[in-house]
Amino acid sequence: MKKTLYLKFILAYFIFGVFGFIIVTTFVPNMTKEHLIREKAESLYSEATLIAGTYAGGLYTSETTLETVKMQLDSLAVYLNSEIRIINPSGRLVLDTNSPLDVENVVVIENFDSTVTSGSYYIVGDFFGNFDSDVLTVFAPITSNYKVKGYVVIHTDMNDIQKSCNSLLNISYITLAILFLLSLIILIFFTEIVYIPLRKITHATEQYAAGN
């Protein structure tokens, strides 16, 4: 019976490890990814809001030129490792840091809808079919005389966020492995302090009962 109890204890130890691994691989990836998305979106939205109130806002009050804003946003886009756009409410692309200025050829984003965020300030997707893969997109309105004149839109590749997520997941797996190894101490203590002495006592009792 004591041997059966010990085997059950070992089985419980391995079940703990299996369930810990299942929980980490099932729940942690989505939780980590959502956290990174929200964190990145918040950071980009702060930048977009700043741009809307300074560089981009100056375009609609004739305080600066399109060329000047383009140069400033190009540098900022490199720093943020993102693509920055200024888009009119109609969907007409005013400026794109990934493309040179071309005022003669008007680019319109089909089906552009600034309300797609549904009360939030970011979305994840291909941005109305503009990208081949998913991007994280944040919107910040450009206002003048209490009217929305356009939007500062910042895109960042979801692959970069996924890479960060994978790095954090590797840390989670390593942490789980360390906890599993540390919990082995409990098994060792149980074996040395409880199981082995109990087995010796049981053996001695059996020998005494047998007249030895």
Give each language-model segment a name.
Residues 1-105, 163:
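Juxtamembrane segments flanking the first transmembrane helix
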Residues 148:
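Glycine-rich acetyl-CoA-binding "A-motif" of GNAT/NAT acetyltransferases
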